[in-house]
């Protein structure tokens, strides 16, 4: 929910595998065949249940986070995390905003280490992209020719969780080189 601990707790308690699969199945039946979310077994299992029920593939857009500095837990190193994304059945792998935005180097107009991560994503047969709250990420990725097939860019008219003005974010999204 990103709005309160209580709402987050309620959603996690109420939305079990069966309920999530039921919602996914409704969307699959209506022709919506992609879902975006974090790297969790629950999302992958619910997607498989919905696929079995409807007979169509659900494309998973996974937004993992992993160590970007040395010294983190070994299971959170990029390789093992990306392996889990592939095992879960991800079609697309868009590193999460919590990491991407920290790697944006405005001075040198680059997203540090992203080329390495994109290569690792492609090596696992997934399609790379970026999940970001920072519109500069989109501009810098486009300018630098980063291996990005698409973006998840936060946008809402109220400006909730947006670091810049809504109209500026809208222009960046409209001018992005990739959808």
Language-model-detected regions and their locations in the chain:
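Long, hydrophobic, well-ordered secondary-structure blocks that form the structural core
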Residues: 51-71
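Structural preference for beta-strand elements that scaffold enzyme active sites
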Residues: 1, 33-36, 57-61, 91-94, ...
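Acidic (Asp/Glu)-rich catalytic clusters
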Residues: 25-29, 44-57, 79-90, 142-145, ...
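Gly/Ser/Thr-rich loops at beta-strand to alpha-helix junctions
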Residues: 34-44, 132-137
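Glycine-rich anion/phosphate-binding loops
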Residues: 16-19, 42, 68-81
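N-terminal binding-site loop/beta-alpha segment at the start of enzyme catalytic domains
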Residues: 1-34
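Beta/alpha (TIM)-barrel catalytic core signal, keyed to glycine-rich beta->alpha loops juxtaposed to Asp/Glu
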Residues: 66-72, 101-179
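Active-site groove signature of glycoside hydrolases
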Residues: 85-106
């Amino acid at each position: 929910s990103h709005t309160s601990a209580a709402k987050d707790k309620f959603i996690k308690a109420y939305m079990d595998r069966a309920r999530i699969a039921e919602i996914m199945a409704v969307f699959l039946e209506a022709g919506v065949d992609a879902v975006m979310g974090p790297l969790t077994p629950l999302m992958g299992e619910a997607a498989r249940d919905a696929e079995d029920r409807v007979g169509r593939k659900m494309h998973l857009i996974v937004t993992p986070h992993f160590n970007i500095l040395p010294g983190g837990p070994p299971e959170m190193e990029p390789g093992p995390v990306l392996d889990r994304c592939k095992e879960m059945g991800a079609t697309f792998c868009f590193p999460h905003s919590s990491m991407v935005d920290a790697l944006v180097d405005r001075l040198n107009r680059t997203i540090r280490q992203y080329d390495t991560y994109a290569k690792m994503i492609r090596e696992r047969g997934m399609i790379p992209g970026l999940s970001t709250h920072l519109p500069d990420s989109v501009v810098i990725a486009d300018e630098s020719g980063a291996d990005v097939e698409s973006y998840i860019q936060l946008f809402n008219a109220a400006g909730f969780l947006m670091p810049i003005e809504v109209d500026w974010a809208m222009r960046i999204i409209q001018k992005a080189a990739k959808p």
